[in-house]
Amino acid sequence: MSGTLVLVRHGQSDWNLKNLFTGWKDPDLTALGVEEAKTGGKALADYGIKYDIAFTSVLTRAQHTLKIILDEVGQPGLETIKDQALNERDYGDLSGLNKDDARAKWGEEQVHIWRRSYDVPPPGGESLRDTGARVWPYYLTEILPRVLAGQKVLVAAHGNSLRSLVMVLDRLTKEQILALNLATGVPMVYKLNADSTVASKEVLGDMSGAH
């Protein structure tokens, strides 16, 4: 068995609260989001991992979540790599719009297709497949080799960028990944085999409230 990979979605952001499409826009965490990150950090502290390196996106909500978690686990100075490859899915023309307003403009069925299909992007944006096309190569070149070398790696990112990873790690079909939501601030701990397959997965919290 090789190293450990921990994935955690950022805590609730201001735009999550306001029901806006966020994508690459850059709101910070709400007070609840801060508490979610602290809860996730405490769960990881109790789990007892000491990390070798962390990865996050270039967006504030993921970086803030990571900072809170690192404080909770007692590693505030941990080496951190920030890359837009881990950014949230780009919602294009939907970014910044209220989801109800978008439904009024384009119709509920069309917005549902953009949100929940695997390979149909919104205007000017990315589909989940597009998101995976940048996340997965980055994982293979930058993150996986460290895990296979025995390192313990923490990744704080976004719902769709992490779903792109979970889809491959958990060997989910397109239909299964579209039905999967990741709760904010809830860590997932993967232990990998030497051939990069998953030896075990633990969820440190409640995924039932995911949205």
From Swiss-Prot:
Pathway: Carbohydrate degradation; glycolysis; pyruvate from D-glyceraldehyde 3-phosphate: step 3/5
Entry annotation: catalytic residues: H10 (tele-phosphohistidine intermediate), E88 (proton donor/acceptor)
UniProt site (Transition state stabilizer): H158
Family membership noted in the UniProt record: Belongs to the phosphoglycerate mutase family. BPG-dependent PGAM subfamily.
Alphabetized InterPro entries for the sequence: His_Pase_superF_clade-1 (IPR013078), His_PPase_superfam (IPR029033), PG/BPGM_mutase_AS (IPR001345), Phosphogly_mut1 (IPR005952)
GO biological process, one term: gluconeogenesis
One Pfam family per UniProt: His_Phos_1
SMART domains: PGAM
PANTHER family assigned to the protein according to its UniProt record, in alphabetical order: PHOSPHOGLYCERATE MUTASE
Superkingdom in the source lineage: Bacteria
Keywords, sorted A to Z: Gluconeogenesis, Glycolysis, Isomerase
Residue sites binding substrate per the record: 9-16, 22-23, 61, 88-91, 99, 115-116, 159-160
Organism (species): Rhizobium rhizogenes (strain K84 / ATCC BAA-868)
Subunit relationships: Homodimer.
Name of the protein described by the UniProt record: 2,3-bisphosphoglycerate-dependent phosphoglycerate mutase
Alphabetized GO MF terms: phosphoglycerate mutase activity
Described function: Catalyzes the interconversion of 2-phosphoglycerate and 3-phosphoglycerate.
